[in-house]
Amino acid sequence: ITNGTAVLGLGNIGALAGKPVMEGKSMLFKVFADIDAFDIEVDATDTDRFVETVKAIAPTFGGINLEDIKAPECFEIENRLKEELDIPVMHDDQHGTAIISSAGLLNALEVAGKKIENVRIVVNGAGASATSCTKLYVALGARKENILMLDSKGVITSDRPNLTESKKFFATDRRDVHTLEEAIKGADVFLGLSKGNVLTQDMVCLLYTSPSPRDRT
């Protein structure tokens, strides 16, 4: 179920335009898990109205999968529905992306011979997917002090006013980094979950490199 306010790669395109994406996700549920899923598009950007709509139709279903709802509203919607419904509620942009991303990270670290508690991580993006992925990284052992998160204004620092709760969680006390280029220098991991074409070839060269030519290939 969606209101089409944050469709991947397209942004706020509205409920109707988001229908093909929901149909595709419903098909994946059936093909890979034999779960009968129905795509529902709700023309409601108001949080209260969206929550009440989902609650009203919930008796028909065994579970709710929230999809493509913009932050920070998506966090409140998920939390309220989990509290007020007696069926499973999942937000795919948060939990689905986080699980897949974390699996990839763990495999990459194993190949590179690195430990998650030691790597420096740069996260470009601070929406639902980015914050959920990074929280799961922390749960798996990554250290918050080794993480830099950026939004459209640059590195999220603890002295910045009017931060949302999700951004406060990952705000850094460092004052020596402001841009993506500065943040990425010497980092081990880059997670890109914002707009495309922001990571340049020069920035890739700033990432941590092993002294072994074999490891660099």
Question: Where is each model-derived feature located?
Answer:
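General beta-strand structural signal in soluble alpha/beta enzymes
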Residues: 39, 65-68, 89-92, 123, ...
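A structured beta-alpha segment of the ubiquitous adenosine-cofactor-binding alpha/beta core
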Residues: 48, 167-204
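Short glycine/serine/threonine-rich phosphate/pyrophosphate-binding segments
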Residues: 74, 97-102, 126-135, 197-200
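A glycine-rich, Thr/Ser-enriched phosphate-binding loop motif common to dinucleotide/cofactor-binding enzymes
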Residues: 91-107
